Amino acid sequence: MACSNDDDEAPKEGYSQVTLKATAEGESETSSENSRLAAGVMSVSSFSVGTQDMEMKYVSQAEIDAGISIGDGLLETNLSAELGTEVSQEKSLQLIVDGESQVTVIGEGQTPNGHYTEVLFTLHQHAEGSAGSEMENKSLLIEGDVEGKSTQVWLAAEKQLRAVAASSQGYEVKGDTDLSVVFDLEAMFEGVDMDAALDANSDGVVEVGPDNIDGNAALYSQIESNLEGAVWLKNQ
């Protein structure tokens, strides 16, 4: 008797079907009906990020079943699994569009059962001449306005980030599961005085980026530093 499609697609033993997504979270403005997400005093209209070399770390189900705690377990990588191969590729993720948070799929596929505790990845700089013109030569771009002034915050660095699970026990994968990498705008802009951002070249756009563009080096350094603690992993 021929196998059904469901049988063909069922995960192999010890594996589950998992979808890894990405999104952004922040405060919602309350001053208008069509409110945007806000990062401090910055009203955000769009947020894009490039990723590559992403890998998911987990404590195996075998160790959990043996009574080994998450803290004492050996962290393994899923790079060789179907999901690991998919999410490790270069990605361009749209996290906020027209002021609204988006949920973007990074990848989906089979991955070993266990408790997933963190996701490591590197920001990916879009190449010169890439299709996304606004993201050209950038690895992260946030656009919006501060008190009516058009504002951009961007990075070119291909730096490694670590999204740690919000739960100290990680998230169990044992059956179909959705996990999300979350960029926290409040944490990213904590202690950053965007009211002080300058448009030093008077081109009509306030830019906070590398090489002291527009004279905002201090703000850029703070955001870049905050970013390392502003990304985390959650389940849905």
Predicted regions and their residues:
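A short, solvent-exposed, low-complexity linear motif enriched for acidic/polar residues
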Residues: 4-236
